[in-house]
Design a protein with these regions (language model features):
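Binding-site signature for planar aromatic cofactors or substrates
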Residues: 1-2, 38, 68, 131-132
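A generic structural micro-feature
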Residues: 52-55, 94-98
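Short beta-strand edge/turn micro-motifs at domain boundaries
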Residues: 70-72, 97-129
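Short acidic-aromatic low-complexity motifs
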Residues: 2-18
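Short structured motifs
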Residues: 1, 57-60, 101-102
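A short, polar/proline- and glycine-enriched secondary-structure boundary/capping micro-motif
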Residues: 82-87, 125-132
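A solvent-exposed, acidic/Ser-Thr-rich amphipathic alpha-helical stretch
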Residues: 13-84
């Protein structure tokens, strides 16, 4: 739950697929799901290539162990980001880009606990300005 955010925020989005099961799924509300570790690697490599600084603020974590090898979880997330901010400089703060909730399912594998599915449900986001 927290490692996902830390990897992205520390500039290591390319390592995020390691957190998922081989057949893991990541889905953002309103977008097509990204399924399987190969597709996840491609998706997070694109994220890694962006000149974007981000901060994922994770709150209200809940985890329910359903069986020895299965669990579910959720947490609230606020995402702040800014593009093109040089390393070591303070980025502009113009509000959260997304406020929502991650809803996860987890599976224990030979490599330990992995994300089987992660869905981002969006509660709030800034209005879209036409032409901008």
């Amino acid at each position: 739950m927290f490692t996902y955010a830390e990897l992205i925020d520390s500039g290591n989005a390319g390592r995020v697929p390691e957190l998922f099961a081989d057949d893991g799924v990541f889905e953002i509300a309103g977008q097509a799901p990204v399924e399987g570790r190969v597709a996840l690697a491609e998706s997070f490599a694109r994220r890694q290539a962006l000149d974007r600084r981000s901060r994922h603020v994770i709150t209200n974590p809940l985890v329910d162990v359903l069986a020895p090898d299965a669990a579910t979880g959720s947490c609230a997330v606020l995402v702040f980001n800014a593009d093109g901010v040089p390393e070591g400089e303070v980025g502009p703060l113009d509000g959260a880009r997304v406020v929502g909730r991650y809803v996860d399912s987890y599976r224990r594998t030979f490599d330990g606990w992995r994300i089987a599915s992660r869905r981002l449900h969006i509660d709030f986001r800034p209005p879209v300005t036409p032409g901008v």
